[in-house]
């Protein structure tokens, strides 16, 4: 990944999934407070669905203790897929899903790859942001160990 700890997060347009699907600049949502952003290859994929996303749901209380104001999950998917995925977990306010529809954000941080020739995906990563500055960044080397919430929390 070309983004590093200490860098300011680049701005890109994504679709935020709240009450409605709304296009928004990442600077408006990720440049405030202390937040976690984790990226993953795709909604409904086995590791993302069985390990990565659930790890952040299970760690909600620990995240609050670390003064994390919000958790965001981003993937190169369309907003309808991300919305269905979020509803399948009944996320409520625990995790805000972001659809990086064309992969512009993912490309801007150098996290893109083409998985099995099936198209643009995001590498798996987790980062801690404070007012838009990357304070901690972990890129996954395996399936989902380093970037799972429990392991990431040990590093911050």
Model-derived features: positions:
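Chalcogenol-based redox active-site neighborhoods
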Residues: 1-156
């Amino acid at each position: 990944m070309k983004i590093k700890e200490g860098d300011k997060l680049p701005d890109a347009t994504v679709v935020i999934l709240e009450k409605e699907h709304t296009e928004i600049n990442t600077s408006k949502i990720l440049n405030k407070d202390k937040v976690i952003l984790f990226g993953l290859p795709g909604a409904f994929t086995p590791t993302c669905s069985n390990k990565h996303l659930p790890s952040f749901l299970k760690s909600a209380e620990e995240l609050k203790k670390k003064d994390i104001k919000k958790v965001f999950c981003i993937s190169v998917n369309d907003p309808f897929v991300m919305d269905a995925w979020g509803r399948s977990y009944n996320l409520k306010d625990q995790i805000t899903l972001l659809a990086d529809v064309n992969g512009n954000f993912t490309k801007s941080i150098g996290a893109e790859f083409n998985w099995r020739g099936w198209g643009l995906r995001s590498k798996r990563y987790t980062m801690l942001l404070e007012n838009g500055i990357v304070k901690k960044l972990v890129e996954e080397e395996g399936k989902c160990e380093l970037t799972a919430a429990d392991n990431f929390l040990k590093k911050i």
